[in-house]
A protein has these predicted regions:
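Hydrophobic membrane-insertion alpha-helices, especially the h-region
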Residues: 14-32
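Soluble "head" domains of membrane/secretory-pathway proteins
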Residues: 2-13, 32-33, 37-38, 43-253
Length: 253
């Protein structure tokens, strides 16, 4: 009986050790290599839609406390093998105060001066190239913006009576060549005029592609924004691929 009990205890001990090893491996991969990420809002439309699933790589910018999954690491200063993002990169970050995960686009690097005038973006005193594009029509799906969304007024029906979203698109090209589409809902939004603000050393200026519906570096922390330029240490990783999209597509970034 004693031998049987001993073997049973050995079996349980091995199982527990195996589980611990697996959990540590998963944590290590999530923290150092890549992890999945779910888009929870419309702030990065039209590039990313509410409900999209992403793969976020952890190594392009080095590692900091924000790289560790599940917010297990205490906030510290410094970054191992740190490399600054490029303008136009889409990054996942921890909010500097709440540690909630956000996803935004890098607009300004350390030393840049950022301003907006009537919705037009200026970097270092020069207007960013922008071009109005034809409206983007997106078929309705379960993640279609609801009445509480700033995009709800663009919900309409096409010729066949199908419910769609018709979005006003402006294509921007940042210094360095990164080109992407943004949503410009017209005048009258508080974030249409901002700055100028100089990005401090060790910080980044981040914005959502849904320019009039994004709580980003232009928006105070009290209004759930980022409250200005964000410390580089708060960046957790770079968005690489949509593993599943609500519109059925998969794209690289």
């Amino acid at each position: 009986m004693a031998n049987k009990k001993s073997k049973g205890e050995e079996s349980w001990g091995k199982l527990i050790r195996d589980i611990v090893v697996i959990l540590l491996l998963v944590l290590g991969i999530h923290s150092c290599v890549a992890k999945p990420f779910y888009i929870p809002s419309d702030s990065m439309m039209p590039t990313l839609r509410n409900g999209d699933r992403l793969i976020v790589s952890k190594y392009p910018y080095g590692w900091s406390y924000a790289s560790v999954s599940f917010h297990l690491a205490p906030k510290t200063e410094g970054r191992l093998f740190g490399k600054l993002p490029e303008r136009g990169d889409i990054v996942v970050l921890e909010h500097p105060d709440t540690r909630i995960d956000y996803i935004k686009r890098v607009i300004g690097l350390p030393g840049d001066t950022i301003a907006l005038r009537s919705g037009a973006l200026f970097i270092n005193g020069k207007p960013v190239k922008r071009r109005v594009e034809p409206a983007l029509t997106i078929p309705a799906d379960p993640n279609l913006p609801g009445p509480d969304s700033s995009l709800f007024r663009f919900v309409t029906r096409d010729a066949s009576g199908r419910e769609v979203l018709e979005l006003p698109i402006v294509r921007e090209t940042l210094p360095g060549g990164a080109t992407f589409d943004t949503i410009d809902m017209g005048p009258g939004y508080a974030t249409d005029d901002y700055g100028p603000v100089k990005v401090p050393a060790g910080h980044l200026f981040l914005m959502g592609d849904n320019r009039d519906g994004s709580a980003d570096s232009r928006v105070s922390a009290e209004r759930k924004g980022l409250g200005g330029p964000v410390p580089f240490d708060a960046i957790a990783g770079r968005a690489e691929i949509i593993s599943f999209s609500t519109d059925g597509t998969t794209e690289w970034y």
